[in-house]
């Protein structure tokens, strides 16, 4: 409990430094804090994201084989699972991507910490058109939805037949969620989405370039 209180105090102090001491204001302070924390996690999230990108491209390449297995063994769940596991093992894949979960877990303390800081009153003030950062804002919620859509669209390996749905649905959920949160936390999500979208785009571009040059075989 003392460790968590120390963590909360650290986030609060850093936000105060950015907003007051550097004169950024609470809105830009939240944006800067988000970019700083995401940058600090970049060595971890980049490594995990790189492996995840390769996994996605392998899964895309395996779609015809996966469909064939489902057609042949779909009526026998046990046999289908065995064949699926065998195919994954041949390709060096696991049924579950634990690394992606690790990246999410690494960011959870930051999200929960910022939520508590804002809940305790560190969200007082205004930013641009937003008069009260302690309350939700429709325009900001739409921006959160837009940045969520950009994040999803940055992944070229989304199934083409479901691409629009996989982009639109998370964006709609993000808008609804942001309308229930204080604007301060919505700024965090918008900034984090922008960072993640840029990282995703760069990762896929890097993998595609390495595959094209022959440095990486998938």
For the regions a protein language model found, what residue spans apply to each?
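Helix-loop-helix
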Residues: 1-218
């Amino acid at each position: 409990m003392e460790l968590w209180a120390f963590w909360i105090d650290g986030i609060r102090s850093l936000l105060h430094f950015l907003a007051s001491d550097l004169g950024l204001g609470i809105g830009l302070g939240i944006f800067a804090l988000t970019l700083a924390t995401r940058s600090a996690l970049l060595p971890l999230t980049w490594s995990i994201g790189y492996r995840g990108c390769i996994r996605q491209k392998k899964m895309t390449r395996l779609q015809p084989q996966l469909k064939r297995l489902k057609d042949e063994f779909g009526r026998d769940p046990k046999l289908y699972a065995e064949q699926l596991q065998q195919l994954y093992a041949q390709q060096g894949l696991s049924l579950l991507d634990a690394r992606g979960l690790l990246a999410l877990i690494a960011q959870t303390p930051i999200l929960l910490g910022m939520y508590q800081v804002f809940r305790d009153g560190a969200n007082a003030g205004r930013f641009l058109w937003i008069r009260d950062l302690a309350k939700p804002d429709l325009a900001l919620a739409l921006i959160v939805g837009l940045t969520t859509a950009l994040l999803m669209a940055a992944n070229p390996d989304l199934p083409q037949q479901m691409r629009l749905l996989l982009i639109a649905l998370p964006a709609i959920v993000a808008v609804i969620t942001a309308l229930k949160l204080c604007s301060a936390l919505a700024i965090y999500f918008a900034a984090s989405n922008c960072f993640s979208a840029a990282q995703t785009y760069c990762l896929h571009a890097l993998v595609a370039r390495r595959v094209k040059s022959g440095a990486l075989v998938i």
